[in-house]
Amino acid sequence: MADDSALHKKYPFLNLLHTPPHRPPPLCPQAPRKTQCKRRLENEHEESNSHLATPCVWPTLDPWTVETTTSSLTITTSTKEGTTVTVQLRL
């Protein structure tokens, strides 16, 4: 049988048999887990205020008005120039 070094010279891929195994790539850091939001469904027997209006609690020159329904939030205020600004978030 031929010498091992002669075989490795003739068949260089045999050298791969003696290489250490490859390390797996480093893992990507995991994203933080989201907290589970528990949605509370309205009970049909409960009374609900379908439309609430609450003035803003922080001091401003022009007060904010916050209105809520079961599926939306609306914030309204006026600029110094008198323009009414309304932001509505639908849930």
UniProtKB/Swiss-Prot annotation:
Keywords: Early protein, Host cytoplasm, Host G2/M cell cycle arrest by virus, Host nucleus, Host-virus interaction, Modulation of host cell cycle by virus, Phosphoprotein. GO terms for biological process: symbiont-mediated arrest of host cell cycle during G2/M transition. Residues 39-49 have a biased composition (Basic and acidic residues). InterPro entries: Papilloma_E4 (IPR003861). GO terms for cellular component: host cell cytoplasm; host cell nucleus. Residues 16-51 are annotated as: Disordered. Contributes to multiple aspects of the viral life cycle including viral genome amplification, suppression of suprabasal cell differentiation and egress of newly formed virions. Induces host cell cycle arrest at the G2 phase by associating with and preventing the nuclear entry of host CDK1/cyclin B1 complexes. Inhibits cellular DNA replication by preventing loading of host replication licensing proteins MCM2 and MCM7 onto chromatin. Within the cytoplasm, associates with host kinase SRPK1, a splicing factor regulator, and inhibits its activity. Belongs to the papillomaviridae E4 protein family. The major E4 form is first synthesized as an E1^E4 fusion protein from spliced E1^E4 transcripts, such that the first few amino acids of the E4 protein are derived from the N terminus of E1. This is Protein E4. The gene is E4.
